[in-house]
Amino acid sequence: MDIHQNKILSQCHTLMLDMDGTILDLAYDSFIWLDLVPKEYAKKLSINLDEATVILKEHFVSLKGSLKWYCLDHWSELLGIDILLLHEKERSRIGYLLGAQEFLEVVKQSDIRVLLVSNSHRDILKLKIEETGLDQYFDGIHLSHDFKAPKESRLFWTRLSSIEEFDLSKTIFIDDTPKVLRAAKEFGIHSIFQIIDPDSNQPRSIEIKYPGISGVIDLI
């Protein structure tokens, strides 16, 4: 495909992509956090699964959107579980969303600068790179932990812009989380898209706040 003939991408100088739920299937992460962690926590505390789930939900609600929410070290310490080990044991579940790798192959052949912009913990990023080789498609990789601020905050975008030069009017950002997209929009990024099918094992997202696409492949 000639990307210069694409109405959306032909005007793009910088393409920023989220990882989980945008490039990679969120089903892996959902399985870890909604299935495996509750079972391990119930086993550790010698309580039933429902009780463990209630306790975990309280933790999740209190931290969602904060940097601690995305910090493996914090969760391992809080729960007394080796969260990274759980991820490693299930690494075979890691995979691209439908059409995502094809999309990356196309934009790799273009003049667009492609950046991975993620809230992921670095150890999880490393694991996912080992399984998918996704790093080969990006000109730069930026994690919220490096900026000490989650993507949901303006501070993240301010700090990102201090080390990455990009024209707000010619930048596209794609993510599956409305609060992250809102922060990017408020910072001034002109074109944003919300992935509405981030998890292959779950129904389509009902919280659609921005122009929605099933997957990144829809842009080509």
Language-model features: locations:
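Catalytic-core regions built around general acid/base machinery
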Residues: 99-111
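N-terminal helical cap/lid subdomain that shapes the substrate entry/recognition surface
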Residues: 7-102, 121-123
